UniProtKB/Swiss-Prot annotation:
Heterodimer; disulfide-linked. Belongs to the 2S seed storage albumins family. The lineage of its organism: Eukaryota, Viridiplantae, Streptophyta, Embryophyta, Tracheophyta. Has antifungal activity against C.gloeosporioides but not against B.cinerea and Fusarium sp. or against various yeasts. Has no antibacterial activity. Keywords: Antimicrobial, Disulfide bond, Fungicide, Plant defense. It comes from Passiflora alata. The keyword Disulfide bond applies. GO terms for biological process: defense response to fungus; killing of cells of another organism. This is Antifungal protein 1. Disulfide bonds. It comes from the Eukaryota. Residues 1-31 are annotated as: Disordered. The keyword Disulfide bond applies.
Length: 31
């Protein structure tokens, strides 16, 4: 379970980063 939790956390972090990056990109494009 420990390893699974770690993997899940890593995946969530990656998704969050991607979302932030996309938002920034959209903001830049808007400008």
């Amino acid at each position: 379970p420990g390893a699974g939790s770690q993997e899940e956390r890593m995946q969530g972090q990656m998704e969050g980063q991607d979302f932030s990056h996309e938002e920034r990109f959209l903001s830049m494009v808007r400008e």
